[in-house]
Amino acid sequence: MIDSSRGFTLERLLDATPEQVWAAWTDADEVAEWWHPADATTPRESVSVDARVDGRYAYTMVNQATGEEYPTGGQYLEVVPHDRLVFTWGNPGADPEDTPVATVTIASAGDLTRLTFDLRGVDGMAGDESFYDGWASALDSLVAHLGQTAVHG
């Protein structure tokens, strides 16, 4: 069992609607455009999204410099359209009890939308040292995908 007290939180304030932000997380075509750090790509053919409770998602990030592939996936634990996604995040098919859990919260903030990304259970896993930077970069890719400027929180 992972230590769910270990992790981090990232925020972005986006000039986009909650519906646009939700679609970026739940539409496979959009996911392929941004769900990777700056030094990687996510081929569209590698992406599958079944955004419902107990549904699964999968994608493969490809390092642009080396061609190394990083299959990633998980299971949706909570799905509240335009508001909240909770999912496991790790190797496809990994035991949910031993997999980090991500919570994405989408909330209106006046004319903007606040995105809060929280990842728990990363301490002691291979690659821990790069998870924060990787997710920060991926969220910056999301900002670019939405064609917006974000305020880092």
Question: Which residues fall in each region the model found?
Answer:
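Hydrophobic pocket/interface hotspot
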Residues: V21, V31, Y57, Y76, ...
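Hydrophobic ligand-binding cavity/cleft-lining segments
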Residues: M1-T42
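Short, surface-exposed coil-to-beta transition loops
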Residues: T9, R44, E69-G73, E97-A102
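A short, structured loop/turn motif at beta-sheet edges
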Residues: P18, A51-R52, L77-D83, T105-R114
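Beta-strand/loop substructures that line and gate deep hydrophobic ligand-binding cavities in soluble
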Residues: V86-A136, G153
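Glycine-rich portal/gate segments that line the openings of hydrophobic small-molecule binding cavities
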Residues: P43-T88
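Short, highly charged C-terminal tails/helix-capping segments
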Residues: A144-G153
